[in-house]
Each structure stands twice: as C-alpha cells, then as structure tokens.
Amino acid sequence: MVKVKFLGHAAFYIEGSKKILIDPFLTGNPQAAARPEDFKDVDLILVTHAHGDHLGDAGEIARISGAKIVAMYDLANYISEKYKDVETIGMNYGPTEIDGVFIVQVPAWHSSSDGKYSIGNPSGYIVKLDDVTIYHAGDTYVFKDMELFAELYGPIDVALLPIGGHFTMGVREAAKAVELLKPRKVVPMHYNTWPPISADPEEFKRLVGDKAEVVILKPGEELKL
C-alpha cells in the first residue's frame, strides 16, 4: 500500500517502501499540516521548481533526514551551493531510477526563479512506487503533451493537479487535464492558500464528472492506494 498525504498548497508526503516528499513548502505556509522537523526519516525530496512556495524547506529537511533532493539540473546546483552538506541529483527531463523508485521528470508550463534570477525550467514528476503511479504536475497550465504522459507511463493511479488559477490552471483547465491524463483518481492542489488562487474544489469535481474519481483532501488527510 502507498499513502499519499496532502500537507497543504502543493506539498505531499508519499509513503510506501520509500518515503518521498514533493515540494515541501511548510514554513510560512498557512495551510501547512506538518513542520520540517517532522520529517527525520525521508529518502527522497522532489522539487518541481525554484519558487519559494515549492522549494520551501527542501534543503533543511534534507539536512535533518539525509534525504536526496531531486530537481532540475540548474536548481540542483543552486541548492548545492546553499546547502553544501546535502546530496542533490540534477535532472533535465526524462526517466531514471533512484534507490529503486522510478521517476520521470516531465515538462510544466510555468517559470522558475528565486524572485530575482531564473533557475532552470519548471517541471512535474511521474513517480512509480510499489506498482503505484503518481503524477505531480507542479505549477502548470494545461498542455496537449499531457496525453503522452498517459500513453508512455499510464495508467496513472492518481494525478495531483493545481486548480487555483492566476499562476496555474484553474478548475476548467484542470478538468481538461484530467481528460488528457486519464488518471483513476485526482487530487486538487495549489488553491485557497492565498486570495489570488481562490478556487472551489467542488466545482472542479463537477467539471470532471465521471472521467476520474476526484478526492478532495484537507491538509493532513491522506489517500491510500
């Protein structure tokens, strides 16, 4: 069994034979359902892009836990400069296997910076752990190539999709992404953290209809797969 816990905003904790964090923005996150010090036993930390609400506490948690940070090559180098005692693995889109976990870094339509300088390209991740396939979209707009993710790496057991609009897809666009990805389940994320990304997950659920099971998680709740 694999458990996918929503930590608020776009942060998730995946637990199976390995323990994986994605975009661990906890400090300063008004939705946060955990603290960095809660993760002393983590194997991998996946970071989709350099914005502070995604890179978050990745470096500090890696220090605490000894976890490896996986990120776009440029971002991995940036993290290594700030946290010289942390192991990073740089990628540049494509599949790999790290400690028995199959990971595909895939494109996302967004930006990636520290607020001043651009730091590599944004990404999403497809993770296969214990025969469960999870897609975390990162911050992105909908794009047709999402069909390829389903074709190459599907069936996708659960897709974690932003629905807040303004910086990412809104509910309508995310519902279209569900059509392209064909996941069995979908969890909305990246909404209602702050007013600019206000969205109604029930409206998203209505728009998705019977194309997938929409699971609306509150921060701290988990989905068992």
Curated annotation (Swiss-Prot):
Keyword Hydrolase: yes
Coiled-coil residue spans: none
UniProt keyword terms in alphabetical order: Hydrolase
Pfam families: Lactamase_B_3
Disulfide bond sites: none
GO molecular function: hydrolase activity
HAMAP family: UPF0173
Family that this chain belongs to: Belongs to the UPF0173 family.
Designated name of the protein: UPF0173 metal-dependent hydrolase PH1671
